Amino acid sequence: LRRVQPGAFTGSAVESVTLFDNLQQISDYAFENCTYLRTLHINAATAPVYSGSYYATFADRYDRLLSLESTQKLVLFSGSSARFGYDSAALDAALPSYAVVNMGVFAYTNALPQLELIRARMREGDILLLSPEFDAAKRQFCTTNAFDDDFFCMAEANYDMVAELDLQQYSGVFSALGSYLQTRAGMTQSSYAVSPSDLDEDGNAVDTPSYNAYGDYVLYRSDAADDTPIYGLPVDYTTAAFPYDT
């Protein structure tokens, strides 16, 4: 199967769809008015392209979360503010009754599906600590239910995560998948054997792991030369300063 045409399943009673990541074309128009469709299974038919990148850390983090499902835990979440900003070992030492997992990867993808995956693995007494990023407020505060291709980038190392989400709670799923597949088709293939901890943030091989078991990026990163906002945004953290288009 290479293409799923617009209207292919319009109005059908399909409940679950299984696709492969060598698909070339698909969009939401193929599944309009499919009110029973809840589950998307994706199987890997091609080599990964995001192995070694920060996207691929999400699957590792999720594996740790799964391993702690029955354990009282502290879950750290956001984008790179969590990935770079926490010392999970220090939190672990200060809160010995909680196991720590750092789920933060990338602020510029919708937090909603990530938080739904996390919520399903949390139990009474667990703690979720958010550190939302100012310039990605719309995505970080779940103001939309729309999927984006970056989420699929993060799911590439474990497509089974996608199948855990109820598609009726989201919009734009298949169009985002189509965008993701078109982009990766033109990228250099890698291998699942390549771990993000083998590389630094710029893709260079490192002698010591760049990520620890908690999910923290632990290589030294120098401070910025000044406090000028990277995206040119004011940093007074008032409601007037929040960008309307993020």
Where is each model-derived feature located?
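Structural signature of tandem-repeat unit edges
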Residues: 1-3, 11-25, 35-46
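N-terminal secretory targeting modules
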Residues: 45-73
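A general structural motif
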Residues: 1, 37, 71, 124-127
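Secreted/periplasmic serine-hydrolase-like ester/acetyl group-modifying domain
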Residues: 146-246
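Membrane-embedded segments
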Residues: 76-165
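Flexible, charged surface loops at secondary-structure boundaries
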Residues: 10, 66-71, 120-123
